[in-house]
Regions:
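Beta-sheet-rich non-transmembrane sensory/scaffold domains
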Residues: 1-478
Length: 478
């Protein structure tokens, strides 16, 4: 079988949101599992609070799921529900659904499926009733280890699980933050941490002992013109983490970012000030190759807000911007964001990335090492330059990772010491791989531009790379 996900592009929406299996020889479709619950799903249907079935949406746009051939379970991640806000999905009533799971199933969930028929075996919802377009899709890493979470390192632990017991785990990190360990046999919650940092602005307010998650309702933007900072935001997006069996640890690339979000206000009026100001700093990257020119992102209506924010040109700081375009938004320290609204009067919705309050700009990004048995986290490597590429671990205890300032490096898997580094012509992107030919091991890395590259480069104030730097670079290990 070939298993694949969909991005909800059809009409009606709900019917086009599914994971499907096809016969690998004939291409015949064998089954579908709908990731936005329909009327024929008694548990999932009720979780939508009466929202019209045809308009429900929750896709699997990200990386593919994982398969356990021994247990015969497909484990797959589902993204946020759309429209992005609770009020927009529920006729202006953000309370039409609960603040705890389940809400708007199977959005922001991990689902376990029977590969023979696509039937749901279990689900776990990481973020119920999302209000901010935070995706919990992308990779699920399957591993087996003992359950020994350190109470000093792990905030949320299931007390009913016997310590020291061996568990078949599925571990994942959401775009909005949070590292979750589940039992992949039944979806039971094991433990979770508010990755990459614990903050009162974290999007999940609590997790009950049995694993039920609660959205941080203090940060819901359901009043016209209301403004909040929500953490985190694209903290671990479309760049895979890796698992080192010898260290029993994940190596997670992350960005210490939050979301400065303001709801639309059709009546216009004054725009609330940023919740806090961000110091404008420069991340010093390596010099550009001689004779090249920086590729300055061009977008209509770009402009800097407080702290050097740069929106995507959609969504003005002022009222009545034609087509929703205008300055980079009123948010500070942002990038990769901007407003959503259309033309006419009023203030459109605005979404702008912003560094976490009180964070160190010289430690804006990095690689974290997390022991999957104990949950202990070590910030292995920190830098001012964010990345848009995967980590890769090797049996020789190296971790390869690159950043948007064009640095590609190998660090020690134990202490984070940089053992080797080079500068490439372009920014490092997904995904770094290793392979061998005739006994010789090679590392291959991709450079170019990604969906969030320009925004993060602007936000970190990195010298943009030269244009036309798409390429694949291969290095031989000694």
């Amino acid at each position: 079988k070939i298993i694949s996900g969909r991005t909800c592009g059809g009409n009606p929406r709900q019917a086009s949101c599914y994971i499907a299996a096809h016969d690998a020889r004939t291409g015949k479709e064998l089954w579908r599992f709908h990731t936005a619950a329909g009327a024929d799903d008694p548990i999932g249907d009720k979780s939508w609070g009466g929202a019209p079935v045809d308009g429900r949406s929750a896709s699997t746009w990200g990386l593919t799921g994982s398969y356990d051939p021994v247990k015969k379970i497909i484990v797959w991640g589902v993204a946020n529900p759309t429209p992005n806000t609770r009020a927009a999905r529920h006729g202006g009533n953000s309370n039409a659904i609960g603040m705890s799971a389940p809400a708007d199933l199977y959005s922001n969930s991990t689902v376990g499926l029977n590969p023979e028929n696509g039937k749901l075996l279990w689900y776990y919802q990481h973020l119920p009733g999302d209000d901010w377009d935070q995706d919990y899709t992308n990779e699920r890493i399957l591993l087996r280890t003992s359950f020994n979470p350190d109470t000093k390192a792990v905030k949320w632990i299931n007390p009913s699980i016997q310590r020291g017991s061996q568990r078949d785990m599925s571990v994942s990190v959401g775009e909005g933050g949070g590292l979750f360990a589940l039992d992949r046999n039944d979806g039971k919650f094991l433990w979770a941490i508010p990755f990459p940092y614990d903050t009162p602005r974290f999007l999940i307010s609590r997790i009950d002992p049995d694993g039920k998650t609660w959205i941080n309702e203090d940060l819901i933007v359901d009043i016209p013109g209301e403004r909040h900072v929500i953490c985190s935001y694209n903290t671990k997006s479309y760049w895979p983490m890796s698992y080192h069996p010898g260290k029993n640890s994940l190596y997670i690339p992350y960005v210490d970012n939050c979301l400065d979000m303001r709801s639309a206000n059709p009546a216009g009026g004054p725009i609330p000030p940023p919740p806090y100001e961000i110091e404008r700093t420069t991340c010093q990257g390596p010099p550009l190759p001689a004779g090249t020119e920086a590729a300055v992102p061009a977008a209509a209506g770009r402009g800097a807000g407080p702290g050097g924010a740069a929106g995507d040109g959609r969504g003005a700081a002022g009222a009545g911007a034609p087509g929703g375009r205008g300055g980079g938004g009123a948010g500070g320290g942002g990038a990769a964001g901007g407003g959503r609204g259309g033309g006419g009067g009023g203030n459109p919705e605005s979404r702008t990335a912003i560094r976490r309050e009180g964070s160190d700009p010289q430690k804006f990004a990095g690689v974290a090492k997390v022991n999957v048995s104990t949950g202990e986290l070590t910030r292995l490597f920190e830098t001012c330059s964010p990345g848009n590429g995967a980590t890769l671990t090797t049996g020789g205890d190296l971790v390869f990772w690159g950043d948007l300032a064009r640095n590609f490096r190998a660090i020690d898997a134990d202490n984070g010491k940089v053992l080797w580094q080079t500068v490439l012509p372009g920014s490092i992107q997904n995904s770094t791989i290793t392979y061998a030919v005739n006994g010789k091991q090679y590392i291959a890395v991709l450079t170019g531009r990604g969906a969030v590259t320009s925004g993060l480069i602007t936000q970190a104030n990195i010298q943009p790379p030269p244009p036309n730097t798409n390429g694949i670079f291969v290095f031989a290990l000694p």
